[in-house]
Amino acid sequence: MGALRAVFFDLDGTLVRYRGVDFESSWGAIAAAAGVSEASGKLLQEFLPKRSHYADWVRRDAELLAGISVSQVAEQIFPPPLADGVRDAIDQLRGRYLLGIVSSGVALVADRVCDELGLDFAIANHLQAEDGRFSGESVLRVDLWGKADVVRSVVTQRGLSLADVCYVGDHINDIPVMEIVGLSIAVHAKDPAVEAACDQVAPHFSDIPELIARHEEAVAFS
């Protein structure tokens, strides 16, 4: 195993923390801004136990937004509430690693965060829009429980190996990725199982570059 070449991040609850919504998520923030929180919350409770039905949940949740102004929602959810320490950590990592977002959240937010932080890519789920309003249509790119498949695809496309990758996440749907990469780090962990599954726990986001450096030093001398 050699030095790491890439660091991939979860979005919701990891890079951004939308307070007052379930899982600090972009989905919840958009629903709140659009005034459909109650209906969206009911859908979440209905579909959350059904792991194989995430695509149906995305479709149904997106339909709630049909006709709502994208700009009015954007005014309420932006600038994205980056977690404390994110900018400092990314500044230390940028230029040294391929940096990207792999999220089952919303691309509207993931793309904005990617641009603001100067990351290399973002992969998330799309809410379609026409004439400045959400159409109610969606494009599923990252299943809640399918992040590992997306990471494998990115690794192949970029000429990397899974051992080259550090992954940073906060919830149980991140565990399948944590189990296959070279280094996994939990931050803002929402479940004890996440801390149990990962290689390292970051007490603060700004600790992540140091944890990566320690890992690489250990690998170099192993």
Regions inferred by a protein language model and the residue ranges of each:
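Active-site neighborhood of HAD-like aspartate-dependent phosphohydrolases
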Residues: M1-P49
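C-terminal cap/substrate-recognition subdomain and adjoining C-terminal extension
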Residues: G2, A83-S222
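Catalytic cores of large soluble enzymes that bind and process phosphate-bearing ligands
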Residues: R19-D22, L65, F78, D143
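Short connector loops/turns at beta-strand edges and beta->alpha or beta->beta junctions
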Residues: V21, V36, G67, L127-A129
